[in-house]
Regions:
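S-adenosyl-L-methionine
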Residues: 1-158
Length: 158
């Protein structure tokens, strides 16, 4: 009963969505020959990607912001997911990313993941409102999978 799982069904993805997600997921996952079969399934014949922590961080934030929008979250709801204490105060009983928040504040002087995820969410929202495509500062991606995007993509036409 996949309908009960908390993620969008493949039919919910448009070809544009797939073009956004697939190269990012491939680059995050395919960093070793151990997962060659996964890369091949996506249509990638090149080698594994280098482990670049800054690039990986940004790709993860792009995906997080993309999925927050795909789920239909408002900015305030997305902020609540990232840092409920900012909305409800420091005594709010639950935080999803408290340990990450503390580590990043200690290391960077800010909750960097929250800031970048919100900035990307805002930029994606601006692009959607202007009816233009979000362009990543990482473009062009190291891999292009357009040729591999076809029948495996969901039938959604969002």
């Amino acid at each position: 009963h996949l309908d009960q799982l908390p993620f969008p069904q493949p039919t919910h993805f448009s070809k544009e969505d797939s073009r956004f997600v697939r190269p990012r997921v491939l680059e995050l996952v395919f960093t070793s020959e151990d997962v060659r079969a996964f890369a091949t399934d996506l249509g990638w014949e090149g080698g594994p990607f280098a482990w670049d922590p800054q690039r990986r961080f940004f790709i993860q934030c792009e995906l997080d912001a993309f999925y927050a929008r795909l789920y239909g979250l408002t900015r305030e709801e997305w902020l609540f997911v990232l840092d409920p204490a900012e909305i409800h105060g420091e005594k709010y009983p639950g935080e999803s990313f408290r340990v990450l928040k503390e580590k990043e504040i200690s290391r960077y002087g800010e909750f960097r993941t929250k800031r970048v995820c919100l900035e990307l969410f805002d930029e994606m929202e601006r692009c959607a409102a202007a009816r233009c495509s979000y362009v990543s500062p990482l473009e062009p991606f190291l891999c292009t999978l357009d040729e591999a995007i076809g029948d495996n993509v969901g039938a959604g036409d969002r």
